[in-house]
């Protein structure tokens, strides 16, 4: 969605989770969504057709919340991403992962990925971006890799942070918390005067959705949020106790518009939200990428209203 907001037209999307595919189709029926394992997807028919190849490589192999097996983890899809880069030969590549990917224990692996992109003909930019610097009311640090093909003038720069524009959790969610007339909403807004910890959507192995392990839950509790579960609805008028977030509240903290529809099952919806790359961050990075593509085209054609083609 963030890349769409930046001016890209999606040529194709590949997604493994069936419920996630259905959500994408429900919101954007015109998108070509392929619900399949990327390991069996053939990118060669799209060679030369793609301006931007973008993807979020699964984070568990690099997350500090896991065993950090990196390339030894069967869920590591960096090799598949590099295969698609070679097959499709996009003008620009964008890869997103968790902060753990930048850990010292992955220095050699990270260097090998950059070297592979260099060999495939790309200049590489790597930076850690915090979602809270781009209007998203949660910390959510993410490692971003940008590869610009060497036949394109590389004027890419990462977007400048503007944390002063980011709301607190209380201000961001006040209307949703007060939707059912909760009398404690104003007092709660004053308590929730910080930026949220990184949102998670719960583990497939450990039951329903929640807001993460004990440390994260404690941080939520300081803002008047019970992180042990997710509510179906906002607090009632006479509710007493510690409020819980709803899936819609989680989505807003992640930067989704309020009209974006998720899976019907709460657990699935929360996992989809928690696994997402915040659209406002993707938009800002996408705008910087589009500037490079537009500049590369300026000598050959007008760039006005040219839809850039993204593949993800």
Residue ranges, per PLM feature:
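Conserved SAM-binding loop of SAM-dependent methyltransferases across substrates and taxa
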Residues: 1-6
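Short beta-strand element of Class I
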Residues: 10-12
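Conserved acidic E/D residue at the C-terminus of a beta-strand in Rossmann-like folds
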Residues: 14-17, 96-97
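Short alpha-helix immediately C-terminal to the canonical SAM-binding loop
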Residues: 18-22
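Class I S-adenosyl-L-methionine-dependent methyltransferase catalytic core
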Residues: 25, 38-40
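Conserved SAM-binding strand-loop segment of SAM-dependent methyltransferases
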Residues: 30-37
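Class I S-adenosyl-L-methionine
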Residues: 41-52, 57-221, 299
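C-terminal target-recognition/interaction regions appended to catalytic cores
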Residues: 177-312
